[in-house]
Amino acid sequence: RPVARGAAIPRYRAGAPPADFVHGGEGFGDLPAKQPAGKPDNRDAAQFLCESCAAHPGEVIICAVGPLTNLAAALDHDPSITQTVKRVVLMGGSAARHGNVSDCAEANIWNDPDAADAVFGADWHVTMIGLDVTEKTQCTPEDFATLAESAPVIGGFLEQASRFYFDFHEAKTGKRSCFMHDPSAIIAVTDPGLFRYERDPVTVV
């Protein structure tokens, strides 16, 4: 499956340092990141997204689980992506709840608010899975142990990587469980009927 290189920095401001105290130095807890066997697509992420949606109009669902820099760049590259994409599902924001990097800001939006405002302001179907949703979906070490047992290679890797994340949450909340932020957005793509939705305008300030 093709992988395209994304933007290195936010749209109009300096990038924040990675949250290695939450996810570890490479994003996998204490585990090292493995070098990929293949090479990235020759196109950057913005071009790749636009061309993929144009090639399959009305079929592609984009699920964004990080800052929205690449989606905003795709809007700049080809504004017609709003007509060719089926919908956008993103993990980010916080509706009627606190933030996780400040009193009101969620990390993915906070890391590139200009891009987020462009994405929310575009004329396409956006589903926001915010902290008000993801902090209700929690997993325990036992859940990951079951995953490792049922899928030893991938599940075993996730079980090992999750230990760092459990340590972070336990130090913060006193409970050995963790919020399932990004997986909640993915589940909203694969099984949208598990969620209840509200239609509201969103602006990033």
Protein language model features and the residues they cover:
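N-terminal acidic, glycine/proline-rich low-complexity segments
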Residues: 1-205
